[in-house]
């Protein structure tokens, strides 16, 4: 086996891979193994197919049906509308997935002790047998982020935060892979569930924006701001990261020092690096959200600065700003 797979770099002092893998479990439970990560690749391929089918054969035709009473008058209008339908279908596909994922994830952790006492993520770690349903939840989540990376690189229109989104998805995939290998699945599920909540509202808000439902969009955007701050700027750093930094060493290896890089294992430091990078991205997007909120108050237009760099969207934005300026005059 490669040197980097040595348990010395991954597990607490005195614990080997065989100690975990040879543990017997009750029916319906399992211990994670890195070989299981192939399931994320298979589910990723399945979700790419799911996206193609749902977008092209369900959501785009549905958008056509709902807009049939207002046909475009020009060829340019037809092209613009088809482009809008495609983007709405993309948002609808993601919103549907996030909704199902959030509901299922919440159901899986709702009766688990570590949802209410996060120190249960570390007590007796890594000897935490994982319910098969949680394993599938983890694999599907990993597969979904593989599908998102594929979409960003080959399918989606390029957005202003293209690189940030790509980095975010790779960080998430790395966290899923490493946490599965180390059996830090308990804390991983808490992160995934809490992050899915706001993603539902973001994609629903984009659909409302495309359809120009201004009142509903404003309400949805207020919900995005509230849930974003609650889950990604409060719960994530002050509950999850704080527990990883303080509780985990105290309950697993009490002499562990994060900044003593000669001390093993090293994998927790890699996880902390990824968690911190994710938090930085959360702060970056929070800045964008509050910028949108400020512009909305000043100009009366809820606009998503993450939308596509295309001539038409820029023209529409400038028109809206000019109209509001004329009203003020």
Swiss-Prot record:
Q: Which PROSITE patterns match?
A: TLC
Q: Does the keyword Lipid biosynthesis apply?
A: yes
Q: Which InterPro entries match?
A: Lag1/Lac1-like, TLC-dom
In what pathway does it function? Lipid metabolism; sphingolipid metabolism
Domain TLC as annotated: residue spans: 86-298
Enzyme class, UniProt record, top EC level: transferase
Give the transmembrane region(s): 41-61, 95-115, 134-154, 162-182, 187-207, 221-241, 270-290
Report one GO cellular component. membrane
Entry's EC annotation? 2.3.1.297
Q: Which residues does the annotation flag as glycosylated? A: 22
Q: How does it sit in the membrane?
A: Multi-pass membrane protein
Q: Which UniProt keywords apply?
A: Glycoprotein, Lipid biosynthesis, Lipid metabolism, Membrane, Sphingolipid metabolism, Transferase, Transmembrane, Transmembrane helix
Entry's Gene Ontology BP terms: ceramide biosynthetic process
Tissue-level expression: Strong expression in the gut, the posterior bulb of the pharynx, the hypoderm, and unidentified cells of the head and the tail.
Q: In which compartments does the protein localize?
A: Membrane
MF-aspect GO terms: transferase activity
Family of the protein in this entry: Belongs to the sphingosine N-acyltransferase family.
* Its job: Catalyzes the acylation of sphingoid bases to form ceramides, which are key players in cell signaling events such as tolerances to heat, oxidation, and ultraviolet stress. C.elegans contain specific sphingoid bases, which are unique or different in structure compared to the sphingoid bases found in other animals. Two examples of these distinctive compounds are: 15-methylhexadecasphinganine and 15-methylhexadecasphing-4-enine. Exhibits substrate preference for long and very long fatty acyl-coA chains (C20-23). Required for adaptation of the nematode to anoxia.
Q: What is the name of this protein?
A: Ceramide synthase hyl-2
Organism equals: Caenorhabditis elegans
Q: What is the lineage of its organism?
A: Eukaryota, Metazoa, Ecdysozoa, Nematoda, Chromadorea
